[in-house]
């Protein structure tokens, strides 16, 4: 009986550890987690390959959403047309580990980014856009890759 109790205890502990490993699991795919951006973010593509457009008129704030990534990496593409301000994308894997952090500043001569995140844990990821004094428009797309 002692071994059965010990085994049951280990199973319960294992299940608790496994379910606590997904920091963003409580959110549905493409569900908005935070939106303090005073401009506009329009999500035009959802599912496993989210994408959309954003506009601002000197606006600032954060826009983040949950994204179901079945792979270990993500490909991010985004571009801006803006003389001022900046756009920063941060990707966190299901455990909350930052796997990509990229910023483009308006008027810097660099207006687009295309790259791959470092490896992370598959599951529900968090996609964060931080827009600062953003005056213009832009678009983004994200795809899961191995």
Predicted regions and their residues:
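Edge beta-strands of jelly-roll/beta-sandwich modules across compartments, strongly enriched
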Residues: 128-146
């Amino acid at each position: 009986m002692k071994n059965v109790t010990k085994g049951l205890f280990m199973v319960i502990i294992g299940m608790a550890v496994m379910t606590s490993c997904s920091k963003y699991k409580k959110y549905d795919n493409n569900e908005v987690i935070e939106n303090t951006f005073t401009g506009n973010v329009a999500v035009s593509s959802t599912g496993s390959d989210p994408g959309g457009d954003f506009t601002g008129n000197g606006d600032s704030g954060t826009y983040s959403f949950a994204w179901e990534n079945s792979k270990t990496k993500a490909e991010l593409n985004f571009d801006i047309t803006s003389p001022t301000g900046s756009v920063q994308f941060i990707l966190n894997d299901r455990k909350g580990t930052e796997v990509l952090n990229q910023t483009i500043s308006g008027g810097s001569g660099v207006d687009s980014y295309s790259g791959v995140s470092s490896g992370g844990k598959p599951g529900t990821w968090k996609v964060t856009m931080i827009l600062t004094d953003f005056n213009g428009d832009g678009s983004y797309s994200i795809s899961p890759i191995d």
